[in-house]
């Protein structure tokens, strides 16, 4: 929201501070200021001058010598401007003055200083300016020539400050207005805040009654078919319209707000929209068939040509303004080409309404059109504003001589919105703020922002336009804003407090993050929504459960239209970005949800499951990733050996380098090398490894209860096993035999050799393990170890494994 400081000061007469003081104070009172632009910051010593005489330059065909009256004296100025003429009133920069930039519109920080000098041997004492050199442009000053000096109107006073005469002696302040403060999307709303901040009187315009003795109902009838989408519709008629430029003061304020002045009628609608925050629209009444306005939904497939000449495809959710036979406007967004105001209009219809903000936003998105008006409606306007803005516009019509306002107004307002009443509880406000502000001071703050106080009921009367004030905390915030956040000291919370702590689930997730970072992984955060095309990139079959997704009803676009059922796309996209930027040895992890619908179409919320995803390329391989997973399991209290199932259906992983992770009989995740085709789909030209852990499975088995055991004094006994193993038997199968048959003395086992070669029969491999046995309370005897080894060998034989001879 951009606002002219001069306009604010006109509504708050006692406000005489500079722009920096204003910005600082408004920010402290809660009206966050993003920045400001001082329009005349780089302009100095520029006056209105009048050319009294022109002579040819003796040594340059394209230059002329002008005598220019600047009020206090007549200066000689050499110029090459093609549009200079005797009698012209122009902006003149005096010797030592500054302009904002060049005539091509480029601005120079600090401006360009103008000095007296000679041009082709002839002395020149100053410079006459184009509008671009004054820091503006032809869009804001359409009467300015494309190439030449800016020519003032004949009434411009010679010798006066040209910057002030053009209205450039102003500052434009940019605010960040949150969506709950709809009232501040207007000059009046900001001015009310400024008056309260600086303890000055707020003087809004006094709107007087307008209209002749005729009845508007003789000119137009209105019916609203969809009152859920249009809570209020007001209309008035203006006849005998006379188009002319709007007055100088109005043009200056519109320019400061970035709005190009057009003519008196159009400028009034734009002016009122900025002043009140209420969009308005004008229709050529002679084009309204049947002299009837009908507010209804569009028909499915209906087409409509808007003011910009574009044909729009509509559906039944778009609200339309229609006459007896056709549509004449898209409600709250843009009028139609068929009812636009032209220079030949003599009678027009003014519209000010309150349309449903959500519908306006969705409609604009459907038809691909967003305007200044729709942006304001989207926020959710106060319907009580519509008639105030309408009457203000009609007042300006009469004051500026635009036309004759017909008496009366159409006002369809079936359910009036009232303000709310909140109990006045100063003790609660002080407790929330840690202050001791008197109740009388609080009431004073409320009255400054037009909140009433009913002494009989001890209630605060909140007007309908303050939709953000709903509870004690909101009222305490208003007290803090105008008491001054900078005056509130530091204090400890009063009252009783209860001990709290993080949940076990949260603590376990934090532990998992710590382990990931300990293993050299950096955290990534990616979107939870993605494109349906992701499944093709990941080689997911058409009938896969992973393709059953939650579809977003209002997506940002097709690429963000479903909720993810796999965490892989975000991780692979992040790895691809790093690879594309030539980053080497990248390790990333992400802790994020997947969304699994219980049934489709949705009848209840989908299941959200937290998953920990690892991804890496470069300095690691499958076994590096496996080691990371085993470290994670061990550090979270899962001390049993995990099993790895290579037969799991994981189409996005390499068929020979993948496995589901099985712990205690349950699948808790998967890991492997990304399928080469998938890696190519993500433009990664290295081997990529990923692992995914289902955190609920970890949390349900994890423990922070560590069991400490003393260091035994008894020695370890080792036995080496060299086996001939069929190739189809996995290492996990061998280790399962060790676990089941090793007995209580088997402390550890370690694979130290795998061999395939000439001395090994085809279809077999040689595998060697070192097994370590230790007693906790005694030295082991040979019989203890032999008994365990016999059971192990028997178990190995049962699955087709023999000792190597």
What are these regions (language model features)?
Residues 448-451, 598-602, 607-608, 613, ...:
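A carboxyl-terminal module marker
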Residues 5, 24, 64, 202-302:
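Glycine/proline-enriched, intrinsically flexible loops and inter-domain linkers
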Residues 40-44, 211-212, 497-502, 526-545, ...:
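Beta-rich nucleic-acid/ligand-interaction surfaces
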Residues 120-129, 133-135, 144, 148-150, ...:
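Mobile "lid/hinge" segments at catalytic clefts and subdomain interfaces of large enzymes
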Residues 1-214, 349, 368, 372, ...:
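Phosphate-backbone binding interfaces of nucleic-acid-interacting proteins
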Residues 48-78, 158, 263, 269-338:
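Conserved mixed alpha/beta core segments that line enzyme active sites in large multi-domain catalysts
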Residues 198-224, 401-429, 436:
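Terminal amphipathic helices with adjacent charged low-complexity linkers/tails
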Residues 189, 422-584, 719, 772-775, ...:
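Extended, well-folded interaction surfaces typified by the phenylalanyl-tRNA synthetase beta subunit core
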């Amino acid at each position: 929201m951009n606002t002219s400081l001069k306009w604010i000061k006109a509504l708050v007469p006692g406000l005489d501070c500079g722009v920096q003081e204003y910005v600082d104070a408004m920010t402290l009172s809660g009206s966050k200021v993003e920045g400001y632009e001082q329009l005349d910051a780089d302009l100095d010593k520029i006056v209105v001058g009048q050319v009294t005489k022109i002579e040819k330059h003796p040594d340059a065909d394209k230059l002329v010598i002008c005598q220019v009256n600047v009020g206090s004296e007549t200066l000689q100025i050499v110029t090459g401007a093609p549009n200079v003429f005797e009698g012209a009133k122009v902006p003149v920069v005096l010797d030592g003055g500054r302009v904002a930039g060049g005539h091509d519109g480029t601005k120079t920080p600090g401006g360009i200083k103008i000095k007296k000098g000679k041009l082709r041997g002839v002395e020149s004492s100053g410079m006459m300016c184009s509008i671009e050199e004054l820091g503006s442009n032809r869009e804001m000053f359409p009467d300015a020539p494309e190439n030449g000096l800016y020519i003032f109107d004949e009434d411009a006073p010679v010798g006066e400050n040209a910057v002030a005469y053009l209205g450039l002696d102003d500052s434009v302040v940019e605010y960040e207005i949150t969506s709950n403060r709809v009232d501040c999307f207007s000059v009046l709303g900001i001015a009310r805040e400024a008056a309260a901040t600086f303890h000055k009187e707020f003087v809004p315009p006094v709107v007087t009654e307008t209209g002749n003795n005729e009845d508007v109902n003789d000119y137009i009838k209105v019916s609203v078919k969809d009152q859920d989408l249009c809570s209020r519709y007001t209309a008035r008629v203006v006849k005998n319209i006379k188009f002319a430029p709007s007055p100088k003061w109005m043009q200056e304020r519109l320019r400061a707000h970035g709005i190009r002045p057009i003519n008196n009628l159009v400028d009034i609608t734009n002016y009122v929209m900025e002043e009140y925050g209420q969009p308005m629209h004008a229709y050529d009444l002679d084009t309204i068939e049947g002299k009837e306005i009908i507010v209804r939904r569009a028909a499915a497939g209906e087409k409509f040509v808007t003011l910009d000449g574009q044909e729009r495809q509509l559906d039944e959710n778009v609200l339309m303004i229609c006459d007896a036979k056709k549509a004449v406007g898209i409600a709250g967004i843009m009028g139609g080409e068929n009812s636009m105001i032209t220079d030949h209009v003599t009678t027009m219809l003014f519209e000010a309404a309150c349309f449903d903000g959500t519908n306006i936003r969705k409609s604009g998105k459907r038809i691909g059109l967003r305007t200044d008006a729709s942006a304001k409606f989207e926020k959710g306007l106060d319907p009580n504003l519509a008639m105030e803005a309408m009457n203000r516009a009609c007042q300006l019509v009469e004051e500026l001589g635009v036309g004759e306002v017909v008496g009366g107004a159409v006002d369809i307002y079936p359910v009036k919105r009232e303000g709310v009443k909140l109990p006045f509880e100063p003790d609660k406000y002080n407790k929330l703020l840690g202050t001791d502000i008197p109740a009388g001071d609080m009431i004073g703050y409320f009255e400054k922002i037009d909140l009433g106080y009913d002494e009989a009921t001890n209630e605060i009367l909140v007007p309908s336009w303050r939709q953000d004030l709903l509870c004690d905390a909101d009222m305490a915030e208003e007290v803090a804003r105008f008491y001054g956040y900078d005056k509130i000291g530091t204090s400890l919370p009063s009252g009783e407090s209860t001990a709290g702590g993080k949940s076990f689930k949260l603590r376990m997730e934090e532990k998992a993050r710590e382990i990931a970072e300990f293993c050299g992984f950096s955290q990534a955060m990616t979107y939870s929504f993605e494109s349906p095309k992701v499944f093709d990139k990941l080689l997911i079959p058409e009938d896969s459960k992973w393709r059953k997704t939650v579809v977003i009803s209002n997506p940002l676009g097709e690429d963000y239209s479903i909720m993810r059922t796999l965490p892989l796309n975000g991780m692979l996209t992040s790895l691809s970005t790093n690879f594309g930027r030539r980053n080497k040895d990248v390790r990333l992890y992400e802790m994020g949800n997947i969304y699994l619908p219980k049934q489709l179409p949705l009848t209840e919320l989908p299941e959200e499951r937290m998953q920990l995803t690892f991804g890496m390329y470069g300095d690691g391989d499958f076994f590096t990733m496996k080691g990371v997973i085993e470290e994670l399991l061990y550090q979270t209290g899962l001390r049993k050996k995990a099993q790895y199932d290579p037969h799991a259906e994981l189409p996005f992983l390499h068929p020979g380098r993948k496995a589901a992770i099985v712990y205690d009989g349950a699948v808790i995740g998967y890991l492997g090398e990304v399928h080469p085709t998938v890696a190519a789909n993500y433009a990664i030209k290295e081997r990529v490894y990923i692992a995914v852990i289902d955190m609920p499975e970890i949390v349900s088995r994890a423990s922070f209860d560590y069991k400490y055991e003393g260091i035994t004094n008894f020695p370890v006994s080792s036995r080496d096993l060299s086996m001939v193993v069929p190739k189809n038997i996995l290492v996990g199968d061998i280790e399962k035999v060790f676990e089941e048959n090793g007995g209580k003395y088997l402390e550890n086992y370690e694979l130290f050799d795998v061999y395939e070669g000439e001395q090994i029969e085809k279809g077999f491999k040689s595998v060697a393990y070192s097994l370590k046995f230790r007693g906790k309370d005694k030295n082991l005897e040979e019989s203890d170890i032999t008994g365990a080894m016999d059971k192990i060998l028997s178990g190995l034989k049962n699955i087709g494994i023999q000792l190597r001879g």
